[in-house]
UniProtKB/Swiss-Prot annotation:
GO cellular component terms given for this protein: cytosol
Naturally occurring in which organism (per UniProt): Roseiflexus sp. (strain RS-1)
Top-level taxon of origin: Bacteria
Gene that encodes the chain: nusB
Name of the protein this chain belongs to: Transcription antitermination protein NusB
Keywords of this entry: RNA-binding, Transcription, Transcription antitermination, Transcription regulation
Length: 142
């Protein structure tokens, strides 16, 4: 299951990156990627929840990112880093269905940053998420 969840997070990252860079419809992009990826039902549900949840709450999540990293405006942040942070923060602060442990959320985000981001992405993502978790811990038990 862990490898499926990592794969789904990587697909969600790619979808959010595309949505942020284009005017494509979230429904159409998700449908296209699901057709390409052929995920099992639990993977499909997880993907939909991550993408639509992070996209729907993007403004709120971006405010949290900017409060945490004021020297890095979200509008100037690399798209990969922004998408990874939105996914992880959605999972950590908003998603009530999964209850993924905070440590696992941060670890998965750092791994995505190592794989898809720049040389500094993993440190940046880890720093932002570590700070957010300590500030917002009361919003979610875990």
């Amino acid at each position: 299951m862990a490898s499926l969840r990592r794969r789904v997070r990587a697909i969600a990252l790619q979808i959010l990156f595309e949505l942020d860079a284009t005017d494509h419809s979230p429904d159409q992009v998700v449908a296209r990627r699901l057709e390409e990826e052929r995920l099992p039902p639990e993977g499909e549900r997880f993907l939909r929840r991550l993408v639509f949840g992070a996209w729907e709450h993007a403004s709120y999540l971006d405010r949290i990112i900017e409060e945490t990293a004021p020297n890095w405006p979200v509008s100037q942040m690399p798209g990969v880093d922004k998408a990874i942070l939105r996914i992880a923060l959605f999972e950590a602060l908003i998603d009530e269905e999964e209850k993924t442990p905070l440590k696992a959320i941060i670890n998965e985000a750092v791994e995505l940053a190592k794989q898809y981001g720049s040389d500094n992405s993993s440190r940046f993502v880890n720093g932002v998420l570590g700070t957010v978790v300590s500030r917002y811990r009361e919003r979610r038990k875990g």
